[in-house]
UniProtKB/Swiss-Prot annotation:
InterPro entries: DNA_methylase_N6_adenine_CS, SAM-dependent_MTases_sf, Small_mtfrase_dom, tRNA_Adenine-N(6)_MTase, tRNA_adenine-N6_MeTrfase. It comes from Aliivibrio fischeri (strain MJ11). Its main location: cytoplasm. It is found in: Cytoplasm. Its EC number is 2.1.1.223. Keywords: Cytoplasm, Methyltransferase, S-adenosyl-L-methionine, Transferase, tRNA processing. This is tRNA1(Val) (adenine(37)-N6)-methyltransferase.
Amino acid sequence: MSKSFTFKQFHIDIGSCGMPVSTDGVLLGAWTNISECSQILDIGAGTGLLSLMSAQRNSNAHIDAIELMPIAAEVARLNFSQSPWKERLVLIHQDFLSYQTAYEYDAIICNPPYFNNGEQSLKGERSTARHTDSLPFDKLLQHCKTLISSTGRASFILPVFEGEIFIKIAKGCDFHLTKITKVKTTEKKSPTRLLIELSLFPHIYQESTLTIHDGNGYSDDFIKLTRMFYLNMG
């Protein structure tokens, strides 16, 4: 596993936290609507990827990043300190479910855990990052509800099966599904991921499909979405 990953405007050191830079994370960070946001919350920050992408995309936003695992929190703090936006990035080493703040967030971003205990055998912090036991969907959504503004948007990425369950739970927590993008690796394959946007306010619903690869490599849509981050992407 590579211990670092360089993007166009920032660098991610992975260190020993066991959380590699993933396509899921890049997709979510590029897809999330943060254009007019001033307060952004990154839940389960890991190496800090989503926070750094948000800071690059929105030059006015203050970003709080919550991370429970000590090693990952230190890695994220290091990555923030080495970025051009360190004044706007705050690492909070805390359990999300106990986190409280005096202000509301315009945007919440989260790449949630999705393996139930026993489904996947991983080690250390990577295991914790991927098991729902550490942050169950219902508790995650209920606490998001207390932190998001009335018109704010919360964005997530999940595998299709888990994503459909997540959406049902979200509706039970008074969230509206406002945007969904079904992600396919190639045109002929079924979707493998869902990019999900929720809000307490019923915005106009949008649905789309994103294909990552075409016959010539990366698809035009994927390049358009991620080109401001990936090196050699145009």
